[in-house]
Design a protein with these regions (language model features):
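Hydrophobic beta-strand segments that make up the repeating blades of beta-propeller
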Residues: 5-11, 58-62, 107-111
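A generic beta-sheet turn/junction motif
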Residues: 12-13, 51, 63, 100, ...
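Beta-propeller blade termini
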Residues: 43-50, 83, 92-99
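A short loop-to-beta-strand structural motif that recurs across blades of beta-propeller domains
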Residues: 16-20, 67-71, 116-120
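Intrinsically disordered, low-complexity linker/propeptide segments enriched in Ser/Thr/Gly/Pro
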Residues: 1-9, 53, 130-140
Length: 140
């Protein structure tokens, strides 16, 4: 929340979700922070404020463990991991948007082996829970 653009990465081979923080200089240098090293086959990341606390959290999709995960920004160097689902068969992508116009961010994912686009509705609590619904199950 310092106004500088930072970079997120998903590394499939070493299972790492990493944040590269921009120092804000005109010729920036970057500080790397591993968010997790256990996102088995990480394929996609997305940044959004998932719990409406004013800071940016991270979502990931991991295809080798079929997982969509949320990493809550606690304001320090540590991130709290929560599994949204572990049944997104070969999870390929993740995105966040307010799908139902209720003021909180919901999660959208796509998974290849089950051809599914799924929506996980945020209940809006400060420690949100998610209700899954399929948008499509034949998204080849």
């Amino acid at each position: 929340n310092d106004g500088d653009l930072d970079i997120l990465s998903a590394a499939r081979i070493d299972d790492t979700i990493a944040l590269y923080t921009n120092d804000g200089a005109s010729d920036p240098s970057w500080s790397a922070t591993d968010i997790t090293t256990s996102a088995d086959g990480a394929t996609s990341v997305f940044a959004a404020d998932m719990d409406n606390d004013g800071d940016i959290d991270i979502l990931s999709a991991s295809k080798d463990d079929d997982t969509i995960a949320w990493y809550e920004n606690s304001g320090g160097p540590f991130w709290s991991a929560s599994t949204i689902t572990s049944s997104a068969d070969y999870a390929e992508s993740v995105f966040a948007a307010d799908m139902d116009n209720d003021g909180d961010m919901d999660i959208i994912s796509a998974s290849a082996n089950d051809d599914t686009i799924a929506w996980y509705e945020n209940n809006g609590a400060s420690n949100p829970s998610w209700t899954a619904a399929d948008i499509a199950t034949s998204a080849d």
